[in-house]
Amino acid sequence: MILCDIGNSTAKFYNNGISKVMSIKEFQKFEPKDTVYFINVNPNFKRKLKGTLFFDLAPYFEINTLYSKELGVDRIAASCAINDGIVIDAGSAITVDMVNKNIHMGGFILPGITKYVEAYKSISSVLDVGLNSQVNLDKIPLNTRDAITYGVVNSVVLLVENIAKNRKIYITGGDGQFLSQFFKNAVYDKNLVFRSMLNVIKSKGL
């Protein structure tokens, strides 16, 4: 069974425990040979995904939410994967959602890590130094690379911890593993959205 999570910069595939990431440019040329069960937030693929071998799972997700109807299927899928806690999907954008006793309470959206880095680069080439995954958030930075990393990571961590309180934090997405190390009460699960998709397929008998 092939699953696909189509975002704004990549299309992530999952098949029998094996994950694969495809660029959006590659996905434009992709022609499936078997049925692909997908969720999609990229408006550029609406026509392509009407093909007979593409099966849209979005209509089959059921979520009890206080949020408006604008809630994207990516956030719905991530939120449906947990019963209680905070779920972070760190991709092109970083989505943060709160779930309390299976009720989606709301959430917020931040730029993705790459967007933060690009923003610094656009200000000055001097700030094009990348990030330090070993930065200590408990100490004031003493060099530019650490200063940028501190600003980027803490802008996410402090906002999340402000709403998380003592709730468990679940993190997924391309930058999820990087971010997870900066939270004390976090679980990183790269296949969290795919598990949610599999649950829908099983529960709906698809």
Curated annotation (Swiss-Prot):
Binding-site list for substrate: 67, 72-75, 144
Active site: 74
Disulfide bond keyword on record: no
UniProt record, GO biological process: coenzyme A biosynthetic process
Record's keyword terms, sorted: ATP-binding, Coenzyme A biosynthesis, Cytoplasm, Kinase, Metal-binding, Nucleotide-binding, Potassium, Transferase
Entry cofactors: NH4(+); K(+)
Pathway of action: Cofactor biosynthesis; coenzyme A biosynthesis; CoA from (R)-pantothenate: step 1/5
Binding site for ATP: 5-12, 92
Annotated catalysed reactions: (R)-pantothenate + ATP = (R)-4'-phosphopantothenate + ADP + H(+)
Residues noted as binding K(+) in the record, renumbered to the chain: 89
Subunit comment: Homodimer.
Record-linked HAMAP family: Pantothen_kinase_3
Protein task: Catalyzes the phosphorylation of pantothenate (Pan), the first step in CoA biosynthesis.
Cross-referenced NCBIfam families: baf (TIGR00671), PRK13333.1 (NF009872)
Identification of the protein by name: Type III pantothenate kinase
Organismal lineage: Bacteria, Pseudomonadati, Campylobacterota, Epsilonproteobacteria, Campylobacterales
